[in-house]
From Swiss-Prot:
One of its GO terms (biological process) is pilus assembly. This is Outer membrane usher protein CssD. One of its GO terms (cellular component) is cell outer membrane. It is a multi-pass membrane protein. The gene is cssD. Gene3D superfamilies: 2.60.40.2070, 2.60.40.3110, 3.10.20.410, Outer membrane usher protein FimD, plug domain. It is found in: Cell outer membrane. GO terms for molecular function: fimbrial usher porin activity. Pfam families: PapC_C (PF13953), PapC_N (PF13954), Usher (PF00577).
Length: 802
């Protein structure tokens, strides 16, 4: 049980180590990382002793415990405990029980629910390892990955700013500046977002507002509301910016098992039969069915993709077997699920000359026949578009999509037909994808109408094909082909590329051959390239070398050699050095040098680079970061993402949080984790190897489920103090017996230890002054400690009379 996490340097004598090791063995929750149950043989106790660890009743208070539901660890949490009868029992509220995924069947709203009346089978607390075991009937358990609205954290009220400043200087005279400022407000579940941008090109300056919008999520309805300037989000139509209002399904609010397409198993049983569905050697369905048709949905909790083998055994022992292959496309949804998107507003000037008013809607619906139906409409001045289609899983031949759209602009009709296919040939470790589209000349998209129909240079048809094949230890092979044809033939193009990636010893090698043909150029563009990357060190702060070469039939050859790497365990300092050489068919040769570095600090990310040759030079500098104003003060951080976590460890700096480079607690104990998944369980983890000396944390891991756009506050309790090994004697000259429990109460938190067989007591995180109470067999003794006892940074051994 991970109750305390610290970084200490121990220096004690040999006979003290023996006592300490024994103490750590019988008291894992104080210093160790074990989760196992411990016991010992009472025959090894001194004669005349008649006690055990269980004979001393621990004090009431709050304990950090590991919670197990039906012997499976659910989480670690601080739980209040009180004495009932001769046991220490947990105080579980209705909200806490619900957060554990248990649906209790009574309306007990008291502070501590009577668990036996709520349908919970049994609760037991193992104090020696601080583990709380809860036995619950399966019918009271929620879905494994189900999240209720009560679990969602809307975060704190905050005013926060993101900023970025870029400067580029070319040949020491041409200067380009860019500044972006994003002032944002979070209030309950409402989000106000803004972006302002400044550009300067020498003496030419522009300042503009990029967007402003207000957003709110409704988790129970699984929808998202946006008012202002935003982007469409459609699986039916192309996406573009608009000003207006949108109401749409937020697919992030669904768990994968609720929204992602998985196949359904259909069949017919001739008699009462046993149905077994296997994926490889794993049984994911084992059910009895009566005679007649049957159907089983496959959930994501059971299924990881690939071929399924179905076995039907009737009452006479006869067996029938068949195979179910499946593939999917992004448009496909879980059977019975509907996803929708409705918008009204005006196209922004970026997409339309006139900013015409429009309305748009689209719906996707997953059917029970391994298919998804979808359709939509767009309506604007002199314009109408109606779209419909189907995506279906046809088994071995893959997933297919047929999409038909019809437009009418100023009484001129056009249509677009799109056919897509995706096949994953898993037995062959291969995949095939193609996409074909044909447009009638008068077909117009919504974004074209502001430009008077944009009937010039219209696309006639397009075709793309992608093949990929895994060669296992021999690498990966892929082929891509694209063809586009226009009605006036002005921009017709063909392109093909063949790529082969493989690993040789420690080197990673990629080769690529490409062929491109454009209508506006008479000559075909043929290119060959090779890239070699070789790691020179194995640790995380790695250094790699790289070499690349490319040659074109135009006579241009380019080669590059360089080194890149990172420093520190979290790679917060990165660097890159390159030397490039370009030779053209006219004999001209250009040599260019490039050097760049970036540093991620708790307060922002800073980047600089320089490139130059004998004819030009270029310098680039960038700084980005964030400022968060909240009820507990101000935090200077890296840029906040769409959904973030503000971690607080009281006034303790330089503690590493998560895996993002440079995210450490700042001078006031705050750190920002910039990117969380909305409506999903996110684990906030402290790197225990980076905890400074003299700091003890009650926990290094917490879990949050933020709403979209939230800044959730995550507080870790920490204590500044040192570790002490007390040598205890009682007033009569004896020592407290093995298993005597010591505790020091600091606020609500209890610092606990256990006495070993030589009277040695190990306590961690002690600071200032205090009183430690020791209890055994109904007896109690106390002793004080002071600053003098804990002045050493190393483990101190202090004699005390109790």
């Amino acid at each position: 049980m991970n109750q305390f996490y610290k970084k200490s340097h121990y220096s004690i004598q040999k006979h003290q180590i023996t006592g300490l090791l024994f103490l750590l063995f019988i008291y894992p929750f104080s210093t160790s990382y074990g989760n196992e149950q411990f016991s010992f043989d009472s025959r090894f106790l001194p004669s005349g002793y008649n006690y055990s660890l269980n004979s001393n009743l621990p004090p009431e208070g709050e304990y950090l415990v590991d919670i197990y539901i039906n012997k499976i660890k659910k989480e670690s949490a601080i739980i209040p405990f009180y004495i009932k009868g001769n046991k220490l029992v947990p105080c579980l509220s209705k909200e806490k029980i619900s957060s554990l995924g248990i649906n209790i069947n009574n309306n007990d709203n008291t502070e501590c629910v009577e668990t036996s009346k709520a349908g919970i089978s049994n609760i037991s607390f193992e104090f020696s390892s601080l583990r709380l075991f809860i036995a619950v009937p399966k019918n009271l358990l929620s879905e494994i990955d189900k999240i209720s609205s009560k679990d969602i954290d809307n975060g704190i009220h905050a005013l926060f700013f993101n900023y970025q400043v870029n400067t580029r200087l070319a040949n020491n005279k041409n200067r380009y500046d860019y500044i972006s400022v994003s002032p944002n407000i979070n209030y309950f579940s409402w989000r106000l977002r803004n972006l302002f941008e400044f550009n300067q090109n020498n003496d030419e300056k522009t300042w503009e507002r990029n967007y402003t919008y207000l957003e709110k999520s409704f988790y129970d309805k699984k929808l998202n509301l946006v008012v202002g300037e935003s982007y469409t989000n459609s699986n039916v139509y192309n996406n573009y910016s608009f000003t207006g209002i949108s109401v749409s399904t937020d697919t992030d609010m669904y768990t994968p098992s609720e929204i992602d397409y998985t196949p359904e198993i259909h069949g017919v049983a001739d008699s009462d039969s046993q149905i077994i569905v296997r994926q490889g050697n794993t049984i994911i369905i084992n059910e009895s069915v009566p005679a007649g048709p049957f159907s089983f949905p496959i959930t994501n909790l059971m299924y990881t993709g690939g071929q399924l083998n179905v076995e039907i055994t009737d009452i006479y022992g006869n067996k029938k077997q068949y195979t179910v292959n499946n593939s999917s496309l992004p448009v496909m949804r879980k059977a019975g699920l509907m996803v929708y998107n409705f918008i009204s507003g005006k196209l922004t000037k970026k997409n339309s000359e006139d900013g015409d008013f429009f309305t748009q809607g689209d719906i996707n619906y997953g059917t029970h026949y391994n298919s998804t139906l979808f359709g939509g409409y767009q309506f604007s001045k002199n314009y109408f578009n109606l779209s419909t289609g189907i995506g279906t899983d046809l088994g071995f031949s893959g997933a297919w999509l047929l999409h038909v759209s019809r437009s009418n602009f100023k009484n001129k009709n056009g249509y677009n037909i799109n056919l897509q296919q995706n096949t994953q040939l898993r037995p062959f470790n291969a995949g095939v994808n193609f996409d074909y589209a044909y447009r009638k000349k008068r077909y117009v998209e919504l974004s074209d109408i502001g430009w008077h129909g944009n009937l010039y240079n219209q696309l006639k048809n397009s075709f793309s094909l992608s093949l990929s094949k895994s060669l296992n230890k021999y690498g990966n092979f892929s082929l891509d082909y694209n063809k586009m044809k226009y009605w006036d033939n002005a921009y017709d193009s063909n392109s093909m590329s063949i790529r082969y990636f493989f690993k040789f010893m420690r080197a990673m090698i990629t080769t690529n051959c490409s062929l491109n043909k454009y209508q506006s150029y008479e000559k075909k563009d043929k290119r060959f390239s090779i890239n070699i990357s070789l790691p020179l060190t194995k640790d995380y702060g790695h250094i790699s070398s790289n070499y690349s070469f490319s040659n074109a039939n135009t006579g241009t050859a380019t080669s590059s050699v360089g080194l890149n790497g990172s420093f520190f365990n979290d790679a917060r300092l990165n660097w890159n050095i390159q030397q490039n050489r370009t030779t053209r068919n006219n004999g001209y040769t250009d040599n260019t040098s490039y050097i760049a570095t970036s540093y991620a600090s708790p307060y922002g990310v800073f980047t600089g680079s320089y490139s130059g040759s004998n004819k030009y030079s270029s310098q680039f500098y960038s700084a980005s970061g964030g400022i968060v104003l909240h009820s507990d003060g101000v935090a200077f951080t890296q840029k906040a993402g769409d959904t973030s976590a503000l971690v607080r460890i009281d006034n303790i700096s330089d503690i590493k949080i998560g895996n993002t480079p440079g995210v450490y607690t700042g001078y006031n104990g705050f750190a920002l984790i910039p990117h969380l998944q909305p409506f999903k369980k996110n684990t906030i983890l402290i790197n225990d190897k980076g905890i400074p000396d003299g700091i003890t944390l009650a926990n290094i891991k917490k879990q949050v489920i933020p709403s979209r756009g939230a800044i959730v506050k995550v507080k870790f309790d920490a204590k500044k103090g040192n570790d002490i090994l007390f040598k205890l004697t009682t007033k009569d000259g004896k020592t407290p017996p093995l298993g005597a429990i010591a505790h020091e109460k600091n606020g609500k938190q209890i610092n606990t230890g256990i006495v070993d067989d030589d009277g040695m007591l190990y306590m961690s995180g002690l600071s200032g002054t205090g009183i430690i109470n020791v209890t055994w067999n109904g007896k109690v003794c106390s002793f004080p400690f002071s600053e003098k006892d804990i002045s050493s940074k190393q483990l101190s051994v202090v004699n005390k009379q109790c």
